Amino acid sequence: MKPEIHPEYHEITVVMTDGSSFKTRTTWGKPGDTMRLDIDPKSHPAWTGVQKLVDTGGQIAKFNKRFSNFGLK
């Protein structure tokens, strides 16, 4: 492999929706960062069979604001 063309590979902590956490190695973020999951295998509809609306960061509100002037009422 060519030297110095690959991203840095380091350890981070992943926190799942139920609060449990584990350490993994990745190229995401910086060494020691924490990744908090909004959806994981314990809460994803594909594995739980339960439908759930997830609006992270007001995405629906942002969409409605952006397209409110089209006037389809």
Swiss-Prot record:
Annotated InterPro entries: Ribosomal_bL28/bL31-like_sf, Ribosomal_bL31, Ribosomal_bL31_A, Ribosomal_bL31_sf
Described function: Binds the 23S rRNA.
PROSITE patterns assigned: RIBOSOMAL_L31
Highest taxon, organism lineage: Bacteria
Gene Ontology molecular function: rRNA binding; structural constituent of ribosome
GO cellular component terms given for this protein: ribonucleoprotein complex; ribosome
Family: Belongs to the bacterial ribosomal protein bL31 family. Type A subfamily.
Biological processes, Gene Ontology terms: translation
Keywords recorded for this protein, A-Z: Ribonucleoprotein, Ribosomal protein, RNA-binding, rRNA-binding
Pfam family of the protein (one): Ribosomal_L31
Protein name according to UniProt: Large ribosomal subunit protein bL31
Keyword Ribonucleoprotein: yes
Subunit architecture: Part of the 50S ribosomal subunit.
NCBIfam families xrefs: L31, PRK00528.1
Annotated organism of origin: Rhodospirillum centenum (strain ATCC 51521 / SW)
Database matches in HAMAP family: Ribosomal_bL31_1
